[in-house]
UniProtKB/Swiss-Prot annotation:
Homomultimerizes to form the nucleocapsid. May bind host exportin-1/XPO1. Binds to viral genomic RNA. Protein-RNA contacts are mediated by a combination of electrostatic interactions between positively charged residues and the phosphate backbone and planar interactions between aromatic side chains and bases. It is found in: Virion; Host nucleus. It comes from Influenza A virus (strain A/Gull/Astrakhan/227/1984 H13N6). This is Nucleoprotein. Late in virus-infected cells, may be cleaved from a 56-kDa protein to a 53-kDa protein by a cellular caspase. This cleavage might be a marker for the onset of apoptosis in infected cells or have a specific function in virus host interaction. The keyword Ligase does not apply. The lineage of its organism: Viruses, Riboviria, Orthornavirae, Negarnaviricota, Polyploviricotina. GO terms for molecular function: RNA binding; structural molecule activity.
Length: 498
């Protein structure tokens, strides 16, 4: 993309940094994940967790959620102003699983938020380390993306469930900052904007007064974030129109849904980063690894390396398949929920199955589930190759359509053709002439119709051996292009209920 020079890299967003050179970025990202690791070790000490209990991904998630809740200022304020019976707004906690007499037992722990904040700051050289918190949010978001599909949420906002590949980051909290905005898919941004417009239509005061001014600024900022994800001039021009609308209403909603559909072929640029559970960083720090000195990148070989030699366990329900649970977590770690399954399979070195074929439910265990029947197993999170994560949705050939497949948003920078059923996608565009910007629409539809398969390839680097840390010898895999490669395709995954 031509505007690359003006953009901060992911890592700069992630660490809130100004312009830094590659070494400084690696060091500050290293400092961030090292802080997460130190915090995790300290929490394991506080909770008196054994080594094995500390490697349990469910315990990791509980500890991550506790620190996120301790720093959620808006919610904390709200809880203090609206006290609910039997809940202490100053405390946070969750289920911790321990091994007792050969069984896993659940124990609910409760901590002062102040105490958690103190431990977190202490692990992060006395700073709030917001970047580390955002990093944990993105890991939770990636886990949700791999576990649930958002059909119901899509239908509620008037979008088509076939757009699920555009929904990356749809469960990220609003407070996730620039790093969070970078990983949100086109569909996620469209959905946030539609919800906002609907509120404005139903509540006349939404855009008025001092609050309304702030709302308007937020609206325009979200429009600009979405505009920045589009790679063609016509899509961007349409976004300008949506942003400049005096009082956004149904015409804007129609335009946004149109743009979301167009993103199935004219893909948006969405960032991908490998965010690992806190316990993985904890294990590395405990073994004496100095992240800040060694440097770390979320989009290179480092996360693959880290997963090659960390042992993480998960609780397994009676009829779940441990290999399937491993795949789910592997996909979450690499933000690969919307990647082509053939690319993921090649990199992982094991067949990656569509969601509907997995015998596994989510990673977290509900409080009413019976612990008597729970077993645990080691997650297989290793890979055969590694590849650079991409922020591009595909390549625009001479500003023509970069096209893709109805249900893939590339995660890895690996060259492939993106097969897509143009008929399926174009069918989504028939018979809706609402919204006003007909010339831009015509232009966008023309680009989509003219996208030839060769414009539709994704030119990436290829994959690399795990010994090739400088990415010198790309291996370009050849894929059997006859198979549909998407994860949620024809699927019955559970819904994510917020």
């Amino acid at each position: 993309m031509a505007s690359q020079g003006t953009k901060r890299s992911y890592e700069q967003m992630e660490t809130g940094g100004e312009r830094q050179n590659a070494t400084e970025i690696r060091a500050s990202v290293g400092r961030m994940v090292g802080g997460i690791g130190r915090f995790y070790i300290q929490m394991c000490t506080e909770l008196k967790l054994s080594d094995n209990e500390g490697r349990l991904i469910q315990n990791s998630i509980t500890i991550e959620r506790m620190v996120l809740s301790a720093f959620d200022e808006r919610r904390n304020r709200y809880l203090e102003e609206h006290p609910s019976a039997g809940r202490d707004p100053k405390k946070t906690g969750g289920p911790i699983y321990r091994r007792r007499e050969g069984k896993w037992v659940r124990e609910l722990v409760l901590y002062d938020k102040e105490e958690i904040r103190r431990i977190w700051r202490q692990a992060n050289n006395g700073e709030d380390a917001t970047a580390g918190l955002t990093h944990l949010m993105i890991w939770h978001s990636n886990l949700n993306d791999a576990t649930y599909q958002r059909t119901r949420a899509l239908v509620r906002t008037g979008m088509d469930p076939r757009m699920c590949s555009l929904m990356q980051g749809s469960t990220l909290p609003r407070r996730s900052g620039a790093a969070g905005a970078a990983v949100k898919g086109v569909g996620t941004m469209v959905m946030e904007l539609i919800r906002m417009i609907k509120r404005g239509v139903n509540d006349r005061n939404f855009w008025r007064g001092e609050n309304g001014r702030r709302t308007r600024i937020a609206y325009e900022r979200m429009c600009n974030i979405l505009k920045g994800k589009f790679q063609t001039a016509a899509q961007r021009a349409m976004m300008d129109q949506v942003r400049e609308s005096r009082s956004p209403g149904n015409a804007e909603i129609e335009d946004l849904i149109f743009l979301a559909r167009s993103a199935l072929i004219l893909r948006g640029a969405v960032a991908h980063k490998s965010c690992l559970p806190a316990c993985v960083h904890g294990l590395a720090v405990a073994s004496g690894y100095d992240f800040e000195r060694e440097g770390y990148s979320l989009v290179g070989i480092d996360p693959f390396r880290l997963l090659q030699n960390s042992q993480v366990f998960s609780l397994i329900r009676p009829n779940e398949n441990p290999a399937h649970k491993s795949q789910l977590v592997w996909m979450a770690c690499h933000s690969a929920a919307f990647e082509d399954l053939r690319v993921s399979s090649f990199i992982r070195g094991a067949r990656v199955l569509p969601r509907g074929q997995l015998s596994t439910r989510g990673v977290q265990i509900a409080s009413n589930e019976n612990m008597e029947t729970m077993s645990s197993s080691t997650l297989e999170l290793r890979s055969k190759y590694w590849a650079i994560r991409t922020r591009s949705g595909g390549n625009t050939n001479q500003q023509r359509a970069s096209a893709g497949q109805i249900s893939v948003q590339p995660t890895f920078s690996v060259q492939r053709n993106l097969p897509f059923e143009r008929a399926t996608i174009m069918a989504a565009f028939t018979g809706n002439a609402e919204g006003r910007t007909s010339d831009m629409r015509t232009e966008i539809i023309r680009m989509m119709e003219n996208a030839r398969p060769e414009d539709v390839s994704f030119q990436g680097r290829g994959v690399f051996e795990l010994s090739d840390e400088k990415a010198t010898n790309p291996i370009v895999p050849s894929f059997d292009m006859s198979k549909e490669g998407s994860y949620f395709f024809g699927d019955n995954a559970e819904e994510f209920d917020s």
